[in-house]
């Protein structure tokens, strides 16, 4: 099993998806959430998560408001567990993980599902991710690794792939038994220690995960001071990096994906509605001889194939009633 490399003094960033290549840089701390459209998700083959278990909250802020409204005790198992799951979800968005909470009575042991949009994979399918959160005060044994392995066999549709990654998250660091079991596993697995306030403390992954191309992944310990200048307290934080650069926040990734999808649709030279964009993908999948995402996202489709797609789409649109 591999312990994430430790790096010091690097303060750069990485653009996850551009039609042009950018150098490493830092991103602004201001975030704007870009909800991906069905068209964008389909273009990049991003699966949609199952329906959430709760209708009254979908992030930490709305959960805390709901918990206060119903007077849910903060020490209750439900409050502690749900709070931690949303905290983990929020923390991992910093590292290009888009996650949804699905934990509930019939969750098959899975708390969060989503995709990991690592740099250099912008032309490929993002890694599907299954997450188990173990918000326990006691030490965790090797059985939690075997439990995570079992979730692969019960994963939702869209997460039953050979590239699906399992992530165990706990406020406690991995014991030797956990590390050894993780190393022997034939599944691509990660262990992350995330404290209840969202601070990342430890990140480990096994050799099987390495095969999926996460070699450039590393860590950096960054130091700072508290906002209270008089106290002079020094803070330290572990962050994940990619080839020595900051991994972009998921908000930035979503913006890039949205912009790329719009540019891709516009590149066909047709003024298409949302429905017609989906039909363009339908036609491309029927006309093109190879995988549509590999051809279209890499912009390697030939002029002849492009003309075939446009002609087939125009014929389909002409056959539709004018109201559409």
Walk through the language-model features, giving the residues of each.
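Mixed-charge (Asp/Glu-Lys/Arg
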Residues: 2-324
């Amino acid at each position: 099993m591999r312990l994430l490399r430790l790096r010091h003094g690097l303060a750069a960033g990485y653009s996850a998806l551009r039609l042009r290549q950018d150098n490493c840089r830092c991103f602004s701390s201001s975030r704007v959430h870009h909800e991906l459209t069905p068209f964008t998700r389909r273009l990049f083959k991003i699966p949609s998560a199952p329906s959430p278990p709760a209708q009254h909250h979908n992030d930490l802020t709305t959960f805390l408001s709901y918990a206060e409204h119903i007077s849910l005790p903060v020490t209750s198992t439900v409050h502690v567990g749900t709070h931690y799951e949303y905290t983990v979800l929020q923390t991992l968005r910093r590292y290009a993980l888009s996650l949804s909470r699905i934990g509930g009575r019939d969750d098959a042991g899975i708390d969060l599902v989503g995709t990991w949009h690592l740099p250099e994979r912008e032309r490929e399918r993002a890694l599907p991710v299954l997450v188990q959160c173990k918000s326990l005060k006691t030490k965790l044994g090797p059985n939690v690794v075997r439990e995570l392995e079992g979730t692969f066999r019960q994963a939702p549709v869209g997460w039953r792939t050979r590239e699906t990654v399992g992530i165990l998250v706990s406020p406690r660091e991995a014991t030797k038994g956990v590390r050894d079991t993780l190393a022997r596993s034939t599944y691509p697995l990660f262990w992350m220690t995330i404290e209840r306030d969202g601070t990342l403390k430890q990140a480990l992954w096994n050799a099987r995960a390495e095969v999926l191309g996460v070699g450039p992944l590393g860590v950096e310990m960054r130091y700072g001071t508290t906002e209270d200048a008089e106290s002079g307290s020094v803070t330290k934080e572990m962050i994940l990096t990619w080839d020595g650069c900051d991994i972009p926040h998921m908000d930035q990734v979503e913006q890039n994906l949205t912009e790329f999808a719009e540019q891709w649709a516009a590149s066909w030279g047709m003024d298409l509605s949302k429905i017609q964009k989906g039909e363009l993908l339908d036609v491309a999948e029927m006309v093109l001889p190879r995988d549509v995402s590999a051809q279209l996202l890499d912009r390697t489709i030939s002029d002849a194939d492009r003309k075939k797609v446009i002609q087939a789409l125009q014929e389909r649109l002409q056959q539709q009633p004018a109201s559409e």
